[in-house]
Swiss-Prot record:
Protein name: Glutamyl-tRNA(Gln) amidotransferase subunit A
InterPro entries attached to this UniProt entry: Amidase, Amidase_CS, Amidase_dom, AS_sf, GatA
Function text: Allows the formation of correctly charged Gln-tRNA(Gln) through the transamidation of misacylated Glu-tRNA(Gln) in organisms which lack glutaminyl-tRNA synthetase. The reaction takes place in the presence of glutamine and ATP through an activated gamma-phospho-Glu-tRNA(Gln).
GO biological process entries: translation
Active site: 82 (charge relay system), 157 (charge relay system), 181 (acyl-ester intermediate)
Protein family membership: Belongs to the amidase family. GatA subfamily.
Keyword Ligase attached: yes
Catalyzed reactions per annotation: L-glutamyl-tRNA(Gln) + L-glutamine + ATP + H2O = L-glutaminyl-tRNA(Gln) + L-glutamate + ADP + phosphate + H(+)
Cellular component GO terms, alphabetical: glutamyl-tRNA(Gln) amidotransferase complex
Keywords annotated in UniProt: ATP-binding, Ligase, Nucleotide-binding, Protein biosynthesis
This protein's record includes keyword Ligase: yes
Length: 485
């Protein structure tokens, strides 16, 4: 079936004129519409764009006219987009009641780059409200479901983006990540998910959660899919001063590491993660099997201690909620989105709009974030967390000066059941136990589907590298993929 093909395979079919863009789009749309009739639909798309077919037809016309894939590397390929990334003239609600009716007036830079490369935008994708959550249960459109087991979460906050790719409703999707929101869903759904180096992709046009941590991320079914998206989206953007120059155009054709190249690698395994009580033994077994494969190919693996990693979760959440409290003050009922005007003045307008517009998890984080930023506690909480973040980054980068990669499980356990942790925020936050250090250190990390539990639940292992080493990470992932297909 067309929908079983990877993003890279579909590109080859388009290049060879074996399939048209319209055929591809309609195949995925049919899967989406068929799933709507399922007793437990995935609920990945919150909107499938009506004009997508028109754009697919235009792509087919360009292909017929001889426009090359060198000029437009993603010509005719459909892509699904998380609902917090601006697409001009389209709703951008972040799956929050507070932003219902808000249409983006411009494109995010990453969207412009995809369109310039010829991609076709399929639709908006479900997410945890304002990107706050680890299960996609905090969405005003209802939860997304995991296509592997529909009683379970696809992860979050980009769970819808992972679900549509794993569920064959889209070949490729964009998510965003602040503390694990791409890698966690990728692990739970059994696909690839990349959190790039901070600054590799522009954040212009992405609704901010935590500005010092947020990054756009990518989902695909194989390593080469991620490489394609990375090649066209990376690089400096004058509209985002945190973006940096980077050229990954060579990744349009991804090659795997040879056995000799793998044999030259030194790889670090953080002891702190392997010795935690929360690590599921079946996840540990999958990790051990991947380590055995690396050792068999000659790589040198060593356990290392980075004690400060144990502070990753509290440090991450302290900083993230503080920045969220500041960033989300703009959603006030005055300029855009929901407006609940009682005629009793602006203070009452703010209170009513935000009380009705925000869900419980967003309220929890905003209230806690404002507490952290208050005059009495900012020194003890926020400023100390900034110092600990710097120590985490220093510790991780010192290891990466001696080793090529850090590897560890993406999540301590496989996907949990829907409603299992929705009323237990601490348990939910601990889903990010192995991911947040990457965001705090601003390094790249790829979640690689590495195996399954006895119950058939996917397990992801993450490959983490130095800043801007995405090409090397993807080469290693492709080698694993080719030898374990």
């Amino acid at each position: 079936m067309i929908t079983d093909l990877t993003f890279t395979q579909l590109r080859d079919k388009l290049k060879n004129k074996e399939l048209s863009s319209l055929q591809i789009l309609r195949a995925f749309k049919d899967e989406y519409e068929k799933d709507l009739k399922h007793p437990l639909p995935l609920n990945g798309f919150v909107e499938f764009f009506e004009d997508a077919e028109e754009h697919a037809k235009k792509a087919d016309e360009l292909i017929a006219q001889g426009v090359s894939f060198d000029e437009k590397p993603l010509l005719g390929l459909p892509i699904a987009v998380k609902d917090n990334i601006s697409m001009a003239g389209k709703l951008c609600t972040c799956c929050s009641r507070s932003l219902q009716g808000y249409y983006a007036p411009y494109n995010a830079t990453v969207i412009d780059r995809l369109l310039e490369a010829g991609a076709v935008l399929m639709g908006r994708i479900n997410m945890d409200e304002l990107a706050m959550g680890s299960s996609t249960e905090f969405s005003c459109y209802g939860p997304s479901r995991n296509p592997v087991d529909r009683a379970r979460t696809p992860g979050g906050s980009s769970g819808g983006s992972a679900a549509v790719v794993a569920g064959n409703q889209a070949p490729f999707s964009l998510g965003t990540e602040t503390g694990g929101s791409v890698r966690l869903p990728a692990s739970y759904c059994g696909i690839y998910g990349l959190k790039p180096t901070y600054g590799l992709f522009s954040r212009y046009g992405v609704v901010a959660f935590s500005s010092s941590l947020d990054q756009v991320g990518l989902f695909g079914k194989e390593a080469a899919d991620i490489a394609l998206g990375l090649a066209v989206m990376a690089g400096k953007d004058e509209k985002d001063e945190t973006s940096e120059e980077a050229d990954f155009s060579s990744l349009l054709k991804l090659s795997a590491y040879s056995k000799e190249e793998i044999a030259s690698l030194k790889i670090a395994i953080p002891k702190e993660f392997l010795n935690t009580q929360g690590l599921d033994q079946e996840v540990k077994q999958v990790f051990d099997e991947l380590c055995a494969w690396l050792t068999k190919n000659g790589a040198k693996l060593e356990e290392v201690s980075i004690p400060v990693l144990e502070a990753s979760i509290p440090t991450y959440y302290t900083l993230a909620i503080s920045e969220a409290a500041s960033n989300l003050s703009r959603i006030d009922g005055i300029r855009f989105g929901l407006r609940k005007d009682t005629g009793k003045g602006n203070d009452e307008l703010y209170i009513q709009t935000r009380s009705e517009g925000f869900g419980p998890e967003v309220k929890r984080r905003i209230i806690t974030g404002n507490y952290v930023l208050s005059k009495e506690f900012s020194g003890d909480c926020y400023e100390k967390s900034l110092n600990v973040r710097a120590k985490i980054a220093q510790g991780v980068n010192e290891v990466l000066q001696k080793y090529d990669f850090i590897i560890c499980p993406t999540a301590p356990a496989p996907a949990f059941k829907l409603n299992e942790k929705v009323d237990d925020p601490i348990a939910m936050y601990l889903s990010d136990l192995f991911t947040t250090f990457v965001n705090l250190a601003r390094i790249p990390s790829l979640s690689v589907p590495a195996g399954k539990t006895k119950a058939g639940l996917p397990v992801g292992i993450q490959f983490c590298g130095k800043k801007f080493s995405e090409d090397r990470i993807l080469k290693l992932a492709k080698a694993w993929e080719e030898q374990n297909a």
